[in-house]
């Protein structure tokens, strides 16, 4: 019999908890997203994360460890190479990435790809470099409005991003161009993990703002995951936020797109009112997109405080046979140099109202403990060539 009827996994996108032994190989030294956020503010109130045991797991300024935490918790190491969104999420559900996704951070995209993209879309391309979304819009937004040229850029991730003004370039046109870019970047020499449509509004430098109509065109996972195992065996596999995009719809039975991280939590609370058996997998992207990449630790702290308020509502709604897992997919230390993700441990906090014990568990060798635990709970076999050790038996 299933131990839990519903498992809610909430990914606080980029909430790393300290460097790994190989972080230096990724250019990350003394990185610690959570601790450095807490050190950047005069006060930091996250009472619900606190009572679950987050400060027992990892030092947080202004937040004391509690004597009797509610959750079972552990650190998780990333087994895959990389520190990006797809790698982290795919690993959670059992896939280990052995070869890093190709990046074009230092070189920009090859001219042959740009020529083909211009020819197929009918738009001249500008940009073609690594930049933050804010920077590239300040530099080229006005130019696009005047000319209709297409802004193409990348980051330290394996991404090709296209900006389009919603009113002058058009949302449908932006999506059309991204679909062409996705088709072209399936070729091995040009392959990227994701093509991302980045719509925005505003008419002049300093006033441009990205909208919530972003769309990710991801590669399909190279193999089946825990999500496929759930769906194929008749269980619900509900996604909130960009989860559906990250897995290109594979293994998803219901998709809910979020306008913000607060909206994502509101959607989760609504889903909690429904009867289902299976998984609800939630990604809250604003922590990463709005605060981590933009190196804004104060904004990050405030977003965490907002999340904590909604977390309290989630805790109140949990049933005896529900399990809540809180985790992250990588780090993005907003006090660190540059604008890139940071390779860090991530937290694993697991709580159910039916638990009688709690406390620290041994560090997991991969993020895949999550998928393995979910699969064991529902009695489904993890697909071939997946990794991960379940901790279900410890969640008592």
Curated annotation (Swiss-Prot):
What Pfam families does the annotation carry?
Metalloenzyme
Binding locations of Mn(2+) 1: 13, 329-330
Q: Show the GO cellular component annotation of the record.
A: cytosol
Q: How is the cofactor bound?
A: Binds 2 manganese ions.
Top-level enzyme category: isomerase
What is the catalytic activity of this protein? 2-deoxy-alpha-D-ribose 1-phosphate = 2-deoxy-D-ribose 5-phosphate; alpha-D-ribose 1-phosphate = D-ribose 5-phosphate
Major localisation: cytoplasm
Obligatory cofactor(s): Mn(2+)
Biological process, per Gene Ontology: 2-deoxyribose 1-phosphate catabolic process; 5-phosphoribose 1-diphosphate biosynthetic process; metabolic compound salvage; nucleotide metabolic process
Asked if the record carries the keyword Isomerase, the reply is yes
Q: Which UniProt keywords apply?
A: Cytoplasm, Isomerase, Manganese, Metal-binding
Q: Which Gene3D superfamilies match?
A: Alkaline Phosphatase, subunit A (3.40.720.10), Phosphopentomutase (3.30.70.1250)
Q: Which residues bind Mn(2+) 2?
A: 288, 293, 341
What SUPFAM superfamilies does the record point to? Alkaline phosphatase-like (SSF53649), DeoB insert domain-like (SSF143856)
Q: Which domain of life is it from?
A: Bacteria
Q: Write down the InterPro entries for this protein, in alphabetical order.
A: Alkaline_phosphatase_core_sf (IPR017850), DeoB (IPR010045), Metalloenzyme (IPR006124), Phosphopentomutase_DeoB_cap_sf (IPR024052)
E.C. numbers: 5.4.2.7
Q: Pathway, according to UniProt?
A: Carbohydrate degradation; 2-deoxy-D-ribose 1-phosphate degradation; D-glyceraldehyde 3-phosphate and acetaldehyde from 2-deoxy-alpha-D-ribose 1-phosphate: step 1/2
Compartments annotated for it: namely: Cytoplasm
UniProt xrefs under NCBIfam families: deoB (TIGR01696), PRK05362.1 (NF003766)
Q: Which family does it belong to?
A: Belongs to the phosphopentomutase family.
Q: Which PANTHER family does this entry report, sorted A to Z?
A: PHOSPHOPENTOMUTASE
Q: What does this protein do?
A: Isomerase that catalyzes the conversion of deoxy-ribose 1-phosphate (dRib-1-P) and ribose 1-phosphate (Rib-1-P) to deoxy-ribose 5-phosphate (dRib-5-P) and ribose 5-phosphate (Rib-5-P), respectively.
Q: Which HAMAP family has this protein been placed in?
A: Phosphopentomut
Q: What is this protein called?
A: Phosphopentomutase
Source species of the chain: Clostridium beijerinckii (strain ATCC 51743 / NCIMB 8052) (Clostridium acetobutylicum)
């Amino acid at each position: 019999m299933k131990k839990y009827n519903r498992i809610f996994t909430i990914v606080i996108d980029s909430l790393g908890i300290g460097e790994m032994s190989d972080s230096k190989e990724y250019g990350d030294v003394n990185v610690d997203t959570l601790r450095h956020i807490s050190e950047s503010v005069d006060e930091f109130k996250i009472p619900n994360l606190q009572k679950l045991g987050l400060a027992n797991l990892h030092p947080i300024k202004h937040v004391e460890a509690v004597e009797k935490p509610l959750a079972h918790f552990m650190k998780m190491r990333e087994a895959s190479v990389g520190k990006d969104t797809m790698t982290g999420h795919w690993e959670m559900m059992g896939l280990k990435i052995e070869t890093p996704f190709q990046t074009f951070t230092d070189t920009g995209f090859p001219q042959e790809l740009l020529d083909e993209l211009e020819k197929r879309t009918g738009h001249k391309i500008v940009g073609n470099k690594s930049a933050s979304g804010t920077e590239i819009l300040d530099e080229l937004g006005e130019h696009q409005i005047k000319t209709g040229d297409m802004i193409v850029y990348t980051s330290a991730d394996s991404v090709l991003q296209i900006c389009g003004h919603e009113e002058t370039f058009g949302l449908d046109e932006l999506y059309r161009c991204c679909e062409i870019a996705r088709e072209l970047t399936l070729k091995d020499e040009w392959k990227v993990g994701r093509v991302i449509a980045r719509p925005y509004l505003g008419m002049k430098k300093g006033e441009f703002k990205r909208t919530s109509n972003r769309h990710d065109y991801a590669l399909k996972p190279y193999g089946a995951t825990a999500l496929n195992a759930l769906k194929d065996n008749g269980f619900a596999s509900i996604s909130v936020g960009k989860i559906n995009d990250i897995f290109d719809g594979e293994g998803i039975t219901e998709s809910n797109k979020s306008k913000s991280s607060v909206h994502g939590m509101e959607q989760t609370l609504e889903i909690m009112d429904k009867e289902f058996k299976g998984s609800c997998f939630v990604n809250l992207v604003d922590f990463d997109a709005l605060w981590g990449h933009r190196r804004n630790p104060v904004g990050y702290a405030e977003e965490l405080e907002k999340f904590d308020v909604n977390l309290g509502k989630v805790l109140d709604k949990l049933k005896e046979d529900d399990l809540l897992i809180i985790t992250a997919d990588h780090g993005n230390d907003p006090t660190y140099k540059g604008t890139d993700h940071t390779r860090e441990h991530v937290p694993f906090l697991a709580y159910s109202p039916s638990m009688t014990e709690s406390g620290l568990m041994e560090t997991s060798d991969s993020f895949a403990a999550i998928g393995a635990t979910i699969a064991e709970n529902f009695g489904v076999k993890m697909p071939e060539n997946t990794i991960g050790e379940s901790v279900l038996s410890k969640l008592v």
